[in-house]
């Protein structure tokens, strides 16, 4: 295959969770921009519809599917809607997640369960659902789970998040081992700190600037910095890659506790 065609996603159907904003919205745009039909999944329908309109204006093809990743029935409905409109999902980007900060001694059981449900249990459930449908349709596929550098190290006040993301890393490896024979690749992307609409104001403060200076490349991740990693793992360019966790963090993990 010519090198120029390695990242071509024409004929693929991609489903992206947490697509209403931030990294998820960017992932949806990138996949659509390279030819995939994209199913944008999140809870905020108004944001999803705006994203779909934006993708269409750029020449891409997308649909909105309102769903909660922690509610299996609603995710099954999203997969059904994707199947009906575009066909079997062949690229799954498990991006949805939450972060809750609390020191260990003050953290509540409810907070722990909330973080685990959104960041680990839902990743397992959605990935299993996607894989089952790929196998039933007898098609190859790619599952990309969004982990974090905190899956490899730790940070104060984020114990639940770090444990969940470490679980995503191991889940990715376990799924890759079991699904390789079905021609389904499973990989993870582990981002460092990225600027999003949620944290942009804080990261622009002096405290945020001090945090950036601790990163070897002296900046936070910006829009577009994950494009290459996503396309590599989703496309034919990564046809022989499975079970990997690709760290994209400007070297931040090098100074992380336990990293």
Locate each region found by the language model.
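Short C-terminal tail/terminal secondary-structure segment
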Residues: 2-5, 153, 231, 242-259
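Conserved glycine-rich cofactor-binding loop
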Residues: 13, 20-21
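Conserved glycine-rich Rossmann-like NAD(P)H-binding loop of the short-chain dehydrogenase/reductase
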Residues: 34-50
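Substrate-binding pocket helix/loop in short-chain dehydrogenase/reductase
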Residues: 103-104, 111-116, 199, 211
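Active-site helix of classical SDR
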Residues: 127, 164, 172
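Alpha-helical segment proximal to the catalytic Tyr-Lys
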Residues: 132, 177-181, 239
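Residue(s) in the substrate-gating loop at a strand-loop-helix junction
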Residues: 148
């Amino acid at each position: 295959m010519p090198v120029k065609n390695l990242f071509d996603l024409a004929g693929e159907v991609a489903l992206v969770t947490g697509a209403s904003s931030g990294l998820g919205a960017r992932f949806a745009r990138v996949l659509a921009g390279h030819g995939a039909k994209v199913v944008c999944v999140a809870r905020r329908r108004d944001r999803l519809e705006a994203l779909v309109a934006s993708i269409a204006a750029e020449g891409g093809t997308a649909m909105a599917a309102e769903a909660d990743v922690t509610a299996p029935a609603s995710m099954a409905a999203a997969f059904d809607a994707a199947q009906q409109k575009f066909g079997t999902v062949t690229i799954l980007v498990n991006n949805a997640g939450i972060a809750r900060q609390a020191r260990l001694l003050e953290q509540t059981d409810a907070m722990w369960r909330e973080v685990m449900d959104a960041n680990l249990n839902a990743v397992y459930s959605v990935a299993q659902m996607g894989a089952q449908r790929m196998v039933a349709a007898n098609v190859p596929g790619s599952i990309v789970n969004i982990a974090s550098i905190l899956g490899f190290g730790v940070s104060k006040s984020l114990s639940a998040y770090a444990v969940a993301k470490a679980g995503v890393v191991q889940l990715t490896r376990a799924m890759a081992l079991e699904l390789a024979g079905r021609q389904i690749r499973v990989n993870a992307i582990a981002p460092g700190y990225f600027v999003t609409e949620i944290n942009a104001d804080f990261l622009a403060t002096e405290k945020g600037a001090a945090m950036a200076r601790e990163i070897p490349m002296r900046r936070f991740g910006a829009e577009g910095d994950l494009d290459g990693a996503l396309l590599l793992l989703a496309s034919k360019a990564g046809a022989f890659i499975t079970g990997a966790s690709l760290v994209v963090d400007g070297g931040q993990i090098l100074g992380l506790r336990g990293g």
